[in-house]
């Protein structure tokens, strides 16, 4: 069975690296991007199975990325918002995200969430 491909989109290098290492250590194929423009480029190359998306980023924010990504042809990966905003649920609903996780987050919580969206039913 092929590895699930996860795209981590966050302008915070330390968070991106932490999530990448954590997911890589349990067998996921991880790609990263520091903003929405980079993320759109990666989606054309990698076709992720799940996108973990920060909302507040320079160049192109999470809202614009999500809208642009969903307007593209082809199958779309679930999007899970990862944000420090206290209204994480509302942020996720604004872009019709499939789920959300508040920062700071627990590693087990992150791994459980990723597993839920990448495990075939």
Residue ranges of predicted features:
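Acidic, metal-coordinating helix/loop segments flanking the phosphotransfer/catalytic sites
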Residues: 32-50
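Active-site residues of response regulator receiver
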Residues: 54
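Receiver (REC) domain active-site loop signature in two-component systems and cognate sites
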Residues: 57
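Alpha4 helix (beta4-alpha4-beta5 surface) of REC/receiver domains from two-component response regulators
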Residues: 64, 86-101, 112
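Hydrophobic/aromatic residues positioned on beta-strands within the core alpha/beta folds
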Residues: 80-83
